[in-house]
UniProtKB/Swiss-Prot annotation:
Belongs to the methyltransferase superfamily. RsmH family. Keywords: Cytoplasm, Methyltransferase, rRNA processing, S-adenosyl-L-methionine, Transferase. This is Ribosomal RNA small subunit methyltransferase H. The keyword Cytoplasm applies. InterPro entries: RsmH, SAM-dep_MeTrfase_MraW_recog, SAM-dependent_MTases_sf. It comes from Sulfurihydrogenibium azorense (strain DSM 15241 / OCM 825 / Az-Fu1). One of its GO terms (biological process) is rRNA base methylation. It catalyses: cytidine(1402) in 16S rRNA + S-adenosyl-L-methionine = N(4)-methylcytidine(1402) in 16S rRNA + S-adenosyl-L-homocysteine + H(+). GO terms for molecular function: rRNA (cytosine-N4-)-methyltransferase activity. GO terms for cellular component: cytoplasm. It is found in: Cytoplasm.
Amino acid sequence: MVEHYSVLHREVLEFTKDLKEGYFIDATVGGGGHSYLILKQNPKLKIIGVDKDDYALEVAKERLKDFEGRFSLVKSSFKDIDKIVKDLDVNPVVGILFDFGVSHFQLKLPRGFSFQREEPLDMRMDTSSELTAYYVVNYYPESRLFNIISKYGEEKFAKRIAKNIVEYRKKKKIETTKELADIVYRSYPPNLRHSRIHPATKTFQAIRIEVNNELLEIEEALEKAIHIVSKEGIIITISFHSLEDRIVKNTFKKYKELKFLDILTKKPITPKEDEIRENPASRSAKMRVARRL
């Protein structure tokens, strides 16, 4: 049984309730939360769950065991969605879901996604990939750190943070999340250190995006998804920061103008107050939905 509900789960179910028989691709299956609810609601659907995280796939397999024969799990990046569809020979694809957030259980694993605990600086979603957060913070030049933190984190104190990271690592390597979070914390002016959002949030986001090449993968995957989904099929995206949301918005707009898509969400859907109370991490989520013409 699902131990917690995935972000915007009610809204996902609303948009998927009328899907016809076929395959639904959960391109970021995580622990299988959305997939579980979709399979339960839609007895004629089969799900292909994709994730690059081995542990996520283990959790999803256990969670979806009641639906044996109606789901397949694939270890892959969602940017390879076209190859997955071809290899598994799935047709028609009536829906595709992208949830770009970090799974709650990934935050619990000691992989450096969270600055709430002392953990090694890793941040890889695919633990077999080479680039780690440790390498980024200890070996990237100051100018590159500034660019990443400024662009991917939209952090106004990026220059100061990059400078302080480089100063600190001259004395010793930055090995843990706590060390990095403390450097960022001290880079903020004292009067801004105690706001609702921790000063390290944007920097951690930026480094995670760099390590996992997230934005380029989102762009590539969306382009492919639009050509994979069948006519009348839907694409649902859940973004957690403005850079992701902007990519989705611009891609949907481009394909609407090309008469490929009908955008079903004129403005992004955000979580209701009760969901935010239950799951504060959902606060920044934005959902956009489009239908293939």
